[in-house]
Amino acid sequence: MEETKVIKVLLLSNQEVVVSEIEEVAAEFGDPNCRLTKPYKIEGGALHKWMQDYTEQNEVMINSDKIITLVTPSPMIFEQYSKVTS
């Protein structure tokens, strides 16, 4: 049975807006507890691979306290994200 992917738009504490598959993971207090898979920064209506200048990783761990809010992507953003990640 395939696990359902949870795709969300995240507003981070540094004001970046990122669309990503997100999963909460068990972690020790203070350790990163959210796994972002294939994160893309939304900038000017376009998607850019998040942290592309710094890494080739497709998975990034962050602390949930760095997420101000998360929402379901609009159909347009979801379609763009699906195209760039498939």
Segments (PLM) and residue ranges:
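Conserved RNA-binding domains used in RNP assembly and mRNA/RNA metabolism
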Residues: E2-S86
